[in-house]
């Protein structure tokens, strides 16, 4: 027996449906679409979310929330990520150069998460109380 001699057992695989190929197939003439109506036509399908004229769910439910524009230009940085910045001074530009924040970010806040590996000077960057204490304990300082 060779690989090219292998065959599925008889009855193991069903033949695919071929709509519109004779009445003996069970899907002849109308091809399983029924008679007339929207879904019998080519391209005939209702839009997603359409509920037959009933007010759709997305219009029955109330609006809620909003997108804060402040979130667009603010970012958070962990204390453990400060080690990725080259040099001893950490500023907005050095964080962007290290790919820790996006280019459009204008304000950054340092959060306490992980170890502060070395003494760094933070210029124009805010920090939480815990992060500030950890950075100062490692010999770092803050400048405005």
Curated annotation (Swiss-Prot):
Keywords: Ribonucleoprotein, Ribosomal protein, RNA-binding, rRNA-binding. The keyword Ribonucleoprotein applies. GO terms for biological process: translation. The keyword Cell division does not apply. Residues 1-57 are annotated as: Disordered. It comes from the Bacteria. Residues 21-31 have a biased composition (Gly residues). InterPro entries: Ribosomal_uL15, Ribosomal_uL15/eL18, Ribosomal_uL15/eL18_sf, Ribosomal_uL15_bac-type, Ribosomal_uL15_CS. GO terms for cellular component: cytosolic large ribosomal subunit. Pfam families: Ribosomal_L27A (PF00828). Transmembrane segments: none annotated. GO terms for molecular function: rRNA binding; structural constituent of ribosome. Belongs to the universal ribosomal protein uL15 family. Part of the 50S ribosomal subunit. Binds to the 23S rRNA. This is Large ribosomal subunit protein uL15. The lineage of its organism: Bacteria, Pseudomonadati, Pseudomonadota, Gammaproteobacteria, Pseudomonadales.
């Amino acid at each position: 027996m060779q690989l090219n001699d292998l065959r599925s057992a008889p009855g193991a695989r069903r033949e695919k449906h071929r709509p519109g190929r004779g009445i003996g197939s069970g899907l002849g003439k109308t091809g399983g679409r029924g008679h007339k109506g929207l879904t019998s036509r080519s391209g005939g399908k209702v839009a997603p979310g359409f509920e037959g004229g009933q007010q759709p769910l997305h219009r029955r439910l109330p609006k809620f929330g909003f997108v804060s524009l402040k979130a667009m230009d603010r970012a958070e940085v962990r204390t453990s990520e400060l080690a990725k910045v080259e040099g001893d001074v950490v500023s907005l530009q050095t964080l962007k150069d290290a790919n820790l924040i996006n280019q459009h970010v204008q304000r950054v806040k340092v959060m306490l998460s992980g170890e502060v590996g070395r003494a760094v000077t933070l210029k124009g960057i805010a920090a939480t109380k815990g992060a500030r204490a950890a950075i100062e304990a490692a010999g770092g300082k803050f400048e405005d």
